[in-house]
Structures are given as C-alpha cells and as structure tokens.
C-alpha cells in the first residue's frame, strides 16, 4: 500500500473537534477568518496551547502593529494559557518591521528561516490581512502578493506542520471572497 496516511489531529478546543469531524487533518493548511473582534486570534491561541509541547512546537508569526507582549498579556486571562510553554515550545515572531519595508520576499525568507531553526509542528500567521493591505499600499502590488501567497502555501505544505493563516474580514468581504 503506497498511500500516505494522515491522521486527524484533535484541536483541544471543546466542541470544535465534533464540528470538524474529529479534528484537523495533520499537516493541513487552514484559514481562520472572520470579522474584527470575533475571537480568531484567541481561537488560534487555544489550539496552539492545547497542542504545543516538547514534541510539537509552535511558531506564531504576528504582523500586527501591536507587539507580541501586548497580545500575550491579553491571552493570559484565559485558562488555556500556559506561560511555561512560551519560549520553550511556543515562540512568537513579530514580522511587522519586515512587512513595513514592503518586501514580500524578505518576509518569506524570515518566515522560512524561523521555521527551519525552530522546526515547529504548528505554524500560525496573524493577521494575513495586514500582508494584503501592505500589497495595496506599498511598493509591491497585487501580483507580488499572489506570488507571495503561492510561495508561502508551497513552503507551508513542505514543512510537515499544521499551518494556520488568520485573516480579518468584514462580512461583505468574506461573502465576496
């Protein structure tokens, strides 16, 4: 039998695995999207803290203007938050400065370098919408963004990690896309 068997990976979020038919496919590429303030980042953190451990590390890239420290302070209010995992099996990387220059290839290289050095089983990119807005207003245009998305998708699937893109969308935009 030459078929590769990919298992279902429970999310660790009460009730979510039932909705997903048992969990997420291992090494899957996932999108967490919704309107502002709907809990996308909190859901991502709940999954990350439930699954991350010594044998499955997590890398959380943030491209938001706020520093990871501010986000960590907010997430600490939840019972799933475990400060002992931060640094050892969960690492935060702020890409805001890389993105500010508008150089998508530089952002890709930074992401790849961090993934290669930390070898995570889980990768999160929050917020993907910030990358799109940079394409619309910066030096690089929509075709550069499309190349970035394709290249990021290709690299993410080759990392043998379950990956998540987190995107903020207004309801009208979500329906249009």
PLM-predicted stretches and their roles:
Residues 30, 100-177:
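P-loop NTPase motor core
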Residues 11-23:
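Pre-Walker A adenine-sensing motif
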């Amino acid at each position: 039998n030459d078929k590769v068997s990919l298992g279902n990976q429970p999310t660790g979020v009460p009730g979510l695995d039932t909705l997903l038919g048992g969990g997420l496919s291992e090494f899957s590429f996932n999108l967490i999207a919704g309107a502002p303030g709907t809990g996308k980042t909190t859901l991502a953190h709940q999954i990350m803290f439930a699954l991350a451990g010594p044998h499955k590390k997590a890398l959380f890239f943030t491209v938001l203007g706020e520093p990871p420290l501010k986000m960590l302070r907010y997430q600490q209010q939840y019972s799933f938050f475990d400060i002992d995992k931060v640094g050892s099996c969960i690492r935060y990387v702020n890409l805001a400065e890389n993105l500010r220059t508008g150089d998508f290839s530089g952002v890709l290289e930074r992401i790849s370098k961090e993934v290669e050095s930390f070898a995570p089983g889980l990768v999160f990119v929050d917020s993907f919408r910030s990358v799109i807005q940079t394409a619309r207003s910066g030096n690089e245009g929509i075709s550069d963004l499309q190349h970035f998305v394709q290249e990021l998708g290709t690299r993410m699937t080759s990392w043998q990690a379950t990956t998540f893109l987190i995107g903020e969308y207004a309801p009208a935009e979500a329906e249009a896309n």
